[in-house]
Amino acid sequence: MVTIRADEISNIIRERIEQYNREVKIVNTGTVLQVGDGIARIHGLDEVMAGELVEFEEGTVGIALNLESNNVGVVLMGDGLLIQEGSSVKATGRIAQIPVSEAYLGRVVNALAKPIDGRGEISASEYRLIESPAPGIISRRSVYEPLQTGLIAIDSMIPIGRGQRELIIGDRQTGKTAVATDTILNQQGQNVICVYVAIGQKASSVAQVVTTFQERGAMEYTIVVAEMADSPATLQYLAPYTGAALAEYFMYRERHTSIIYDDPSKQAQAYRQMSLLLRRPPGREAYPGDVFYLHSRLLERAAKLSSRLGEGSMTALPIVETQSGDVSAYIPTNVISITDGQIFLSADLFNAGIRPAINVGISVSRVGSAAQIKAMKQVAGKLKLELAQFAELEAFAQFASDLDKATQNQLARGQRLRELLKQSQSAPLTVEEQIMTIYTGTNGYLDLLEIGQVRKFLVELRTYLKTNKPKFQEIISSTKTFTEEAEALLKEAIQEQTDRFILQEQA
């Protein structure tokens, strides 16, 4: 039989008492009163902050949005199917934040910056708040460098600068996403980081965009943030801010970034859903009163930083879908008033085979020629004027039977100019190729050709110029000016190519 020694027992008790650590941990907790439709009402959580993350006992995370006198309204970041009435909730003391690092390049992530492309975890040591304040006036400088989209119609007449916010607006199926993805493809070799945010899109559409980027080697400098149509409203609402936080990480590291939001009207719908379920009073079109602030605080984060902060930039291209061309609806007018110009895509032009279907008459860039290189300014001024005159003449010519020779010539020139603005999808042009194309059209070198021959001739001319007159490209890329020497080289190339082309066509 084991003998019990009193001194041994007292030693053990003494040791345990010495090891005891008096640590008081205060946890701010609450109880679920009601849950459903992605919303939970919590009693308690007395010291919770607006926008603070809260954690339910079964693991779901939510954001405290409504702080009322007797309860807290929380939006859930998951389905919350296991949350029950009476289960406990604890405040985390953290505002929503995401990890950020260079390792995100080439990846597809969700609104919480978690990878969804099946390629493993992303390593990151730094965190950024999803909602961070926009740079102030002193932190910015005016936009002066061009962000080339590779589309002649935009780069010549509606130029976009680094740090600008340009809205892409139009009906469904008019090529809005195509304009945005072409802009990303054209950033290859330009040292611009691109972020594509898909909000409430079909999974198949996002997969198609990602495949295009992968095939064209654009994923190397691109991050895709995607929340599909079946995602909870909270995550669709957060996705654009997550994209902005990722872009800001690079902007504050003296890099140039471009971010595409596709599309903020879906974010507004998700926010409307959350607000109505939280019983916030509805306003126009049942949107809550602060839906303007929802988009303004997002788009104001795009900026061209001052030289003191390293001159990084973030260019925002929000895409908004209109219903049968109605630009005066609530969300389109809000976003138009926040952005520095808009590119309007028309369903009529799209159906008439003019693609990209940009309506040059009502599209505008409020930065203007400050965002163009000198060479482009030299050739593009004439183009906009001639196209505007052509549009006016064309409307008038429908009613006139006999037109004088000068008017007929002007109409013929206008038709050829419209033809040179047409481009295939995923075929962006370099700025040198654009200058060559515009010069050829505005100086009447296409007037000899039939309209159907214009595109074929221009494709062959680009190839001919690249192989036989490489100095032209060198002059423009080094001096950024359309010099007399460059003009002479271009005239020679056009003349030689025209002779070759006419001989080919006759043969």
Curated annotation (Swiss-Prot):
Question: GO molecular-function annotation terms?
Answer: ADP binding; ATP binding; proton-transporting ATP synthase activity, rotational mechanism
Q: Which domain of life is it from?
A: Eukaryota
Q: Locate the residues binding ATP.
A: G170, D171, R172, Q173, T174, G175, K176, T177
Catalytic reaction equation(s)? ATP + H2O + 4 H(+)(in) = ADP + phosphate + 5 H(+)(out)
List the InterPro entries hit by this protein, alphabetically. Answer: ATP_synth_asu-like_sf (IPR023366), ATP_synth_asu_C (IPR000793), ATP_synth_asu_C_sf (IPR038376), ATP_synth_F1_a_nt-bd_dom (IPR033732), ATP_synth_F1_asu (IPR005294), ATPase_a/bsu_AS (IPR020003), ATPase_F1/V1/A1_a/bsu_N (IPR004100), ATPase_F1/V1/A1_a/bsu_N_sf (IPR036121)
- What enzyme class is recorded for this protein? translocase
Q: Return the GO cellular component terms, semicolon-separated.
A: chloroplast thylakoid membrane; proton-transporting ATP synthase complex
Tell me, in a sentence or two, what this protein's role is: Produces ATP from ADP in the presence of a proton gradient across the membrane. The alpha chain is a regulatory subunit.
This one is known as: ATP synthase subunit alpha, chloroplastic
**Species:** Panax ginseng
Q: What is the lineage of its organism?
A: Eukaryota, Viridiplantae, Streptophyta, Embryophyta, Tracheophyta
Gene transcribed to yield this protein: atpA
